[in-house]
Structures are given as C-alpha cells and as structure tokens.
Amino acid sequence: MTIKVVTFDLDDTLWPLRETILAAHKSANDFLASQVPSVKEILSTNKEREVWGQLIEKDPTMRHRLSELRFNVFKNILQSLGQTEQQAEKLSSEALQIFMNGRHQLTLFDGVEEVLAQLKEKYTLGVLTNGNADIKRLGIDHYFNFSFSAEELNDSKPSATHFKKAMEFT
C-alpha cells in the first residue's frame, strides 16, 4: 500500500497547547474583569466550568463548536451578573476576539516547518483538528492541502467524519 495522504492534529502536535490556552484564557478573563469587576469572582471558581458543562448538556453538539461555546459561556456569566443581553453579547464578542488573538500567539515545536516542507514534496498533507486554531492565521496553511475542524464538521475526533473527509484526498 502506498501512502498518499498524511494528516496532522494541531494542538500538542505542531505546538504546545497548555501555555497558549492558559495565556489566552487569562487575557480574555482579565478583559472581562476590567469591564465587569464582579466577573472575577466567578472566573476564579469552578462556576465557569459548570457553565461549560450546562451549555454542553443543553446542546451536546456545542462541544464541537468551541468558539461558540466560549462566547456563550462568557455571555451566560455576564448575564448572570446583571448585564443586558446586548451588553453581554458585546463584551463576549470582544473577549472571544482577545482569546482568539492569544490562542494564535504560539510557537511551533522545533523542526515542524522543516518537516512539513519535506513531507509536502512527497505527500498530500492535511489537518484534522478538534480545536479552533486557524492555519491561515498562523501562516502555515501553505503546507497543507486541506484542513477540517470539529467546528466546521460539527463532529469531533475520534469520530470517523474527519477521517472520511481526509479520504476524499486519496
């Protein structure tokens, strides 16, 4: 059998995730606390995680749409603190943008670009991710022939959906 397509996950495969997400999360939370000081009390407890769980329980497909889920967590918390829907949506949108900016401030593992360049010469390369990183925004999209995310497919690995989409490139 000849290998034609090589796929990659992104987080913790091409770059370390934990530090990046923690910094992005802190930036978004700091912004919200600067706008609504009482939010700090909720964001420093397990209440935030509880809201994540409640939203996923209410709509299980939300687990595939991390950006939308994060926005709704922010919005839910802000509204619980007395912000109007309009205020909560505005602040949540701004906080999500801050999070996404931070989420894309990362450093690839050593040698990643060199290896991708070598593999690109011989194989079709693709991305299959449950995360919400944007390879175009990261400037590495030129290495890949395709990219599928859980948000885009409304399904998460290890479900077969991602892999079936990748097979379309064989």
Predicted regions and their residues:
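Short, compositionally biased strand/turn segments
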Residues: L22, K122-Y123
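N-terminal helical cap/lid subdomain that shapes the substrate entry/recognition surface
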Residues: T2-L108
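Active-site phosphate/pyrophosphate-handling residues
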Residues: N72, E114, T161
